[in-house]
A protein has these predicted regions:
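N-terminal Rossmann-like FAD-binding beta1-loop-alpha1 element of flavoenzymes
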Residues: 108-135
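Residue-level detector of alpha-helix initiation sites
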Residues: 54, 116-117, 141
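Ferredoxin-type iron-sulfur electron-transfer modules and their immediate structural context
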Residues: 1-109
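Glycine-rich FAD pyrophosphate-binding loop
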Residues: 131-145
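Generic detector of intrinsically disordered, low-complexity, polar/charged segments
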Residues: 104, 111-113, 140-141
């Protein structure tokens, strides 16, 4: 038991990269996310989450919790239910408008091929950085397969 606690302390709290962060497709900084929620700083938690995932409400609902599979806590009482924490950040934050920055337009055009969620997230990130983005989709609707 002490060996497991040391492993959790080292890889989740202190020294090593947390396995949950590397298993998350968005690399959400869980070490920062959870303490913000513990302090009930939902707006700060939401901002961190939104900066990682681009579409926070959608991702909070469809998250497959890949982090649970690698969480060392699963062996001593259960993995952290990050999906519920994501939903809490989305639900209880009262400032969810995108941040606005006064950046000058880049003057460059970018084409994004496909309108699945990953392509739309890419287009959103580029547009936020003031690129002129055009999304091309061969189907009549967006959202991917």
């Amino acid at each position: 038991m002490d060996e497991m606690k040391d492993k959790i302390r080292n890889c989740c709290l202190e020294k090593e990269a947390a396995p949950c962060v590397s298993s998350c497709p968005f690399h959400l900084d869980i070490r920062e996310f959870i303490p913000r929620l513990e302090r009930k700083a939902f707006n700060l938690a939401y901002r961190l989450y939104a900066n990682s995932v681009a579409f926070p409400r959608i991702v909070a609902e469809i998250c497959d919790e890949s982090c649970k599979k690698v969480c060392p806590r699963k062996e001593i009482g259960g993995a952290i239910n990050l999906s519920m924490l994501e939903k809490a950040a989305v639900t209880y934050a009262d400032r969810t408008d995108p941040s606005s920055f006064n950046l000058r337009p880049k003057g460059k055009k970018v084409a994004v091929i496909g309108a699945g969620i990953s392509s739309l997230a890419c287009a959103l990130r580029l547009a936020n950085k003031k690129y002129d983005v055009t999304v091309y989709e061969k189907e009549d609707k967006i959202g991917g397969h």
